[in-house]
Amino acid sequence: NVALGVSALSTDTAGSRSTALGYFTLTTQNFTGATDSYNTAVGFAAGQLVTTGTNNTFVGGLAGDATDDGGSNTAVGYLSLSANAGDQNTAVGDSSLGVVTGDNNTAIGRAAGLQITSGSNNIAIGLDALRTGSPGGAQTSASNKIGLGDENISSANIQVDWTVASDARDKTDFTALDLGLDFVKALSPITYKWDKRAKYIDKTDVTTYDDDGNIDHEGWDITTDLNTITHDGTHKEDWLDVGFKAQDVETLEKAAGYKIADKTNLLTSLTGDGKQMGLQYSKFVPILVKAIQEQQTAIEALTARITT
């Protein structure tokens, strides 16, 4: 072991192959048997509460400071992965992945994934990704989600088309789509300007402390002070967009029998915190194809009548 700093690795008697650099780093690590812990902590109080967790890397002041028995985690940045009991989580950025009991989460960017608690297999990239106001909304217990950026992202660019998995061998319960021309005729295409509610929320990060002056990890979910500003149009964008209202499409979905409890509908979706609706525009393609086919059938029938 290598220890440099006040109380660094001060209670470990049997663990080995750990490195602690800084005040109170890995100060409570204590293995009762001969164990290769392979923990690395660099920065003020980084990993200070790790007891039996192994293969962890914490770099930054208070990085992983309330992590106990989690393993194979990586945290880089002040307060990153601060209170963690999960495994294989990666957090890079100030306050990223603050309190996590889930596993296999990845967060890159300041406060990315900050509100994820028990969720697993999530990916949050960019400032405030998967946090209140972001396109993915605040994710807490949800799993298998990807969030890119916050509410200020205005465009996304990639050199080639996305390839979406669609192998028939991975699908079952095939039925012919019954949404076609009638559904398309009922849609209401619109132009609009964005005036996002999230822009009227003043997100001021505050850190709460317990009676002893330590960071209150149990109250982390309230460490964001949200001050709502009047929604008066001052943040309205000056450029036009085109599309549909998600609520209108959901109404059509329900009428067609595609509303399944509170789960994601065929075309509409709801963020994990239930605060923002979205549309999966790529799924309109099969419906448009069906509508064209139905229309072509009608055209051919009329043509046949005219020619005979």
Each language-model region and where it sits:
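Intramolecular chaperone/auto-protease modules of tailspike-like proteins
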Residues: 166-308
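Glycine- and small/polar-enriched repetitive beta-structure motifs of secreted/surface proteins
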Residues: 1-167
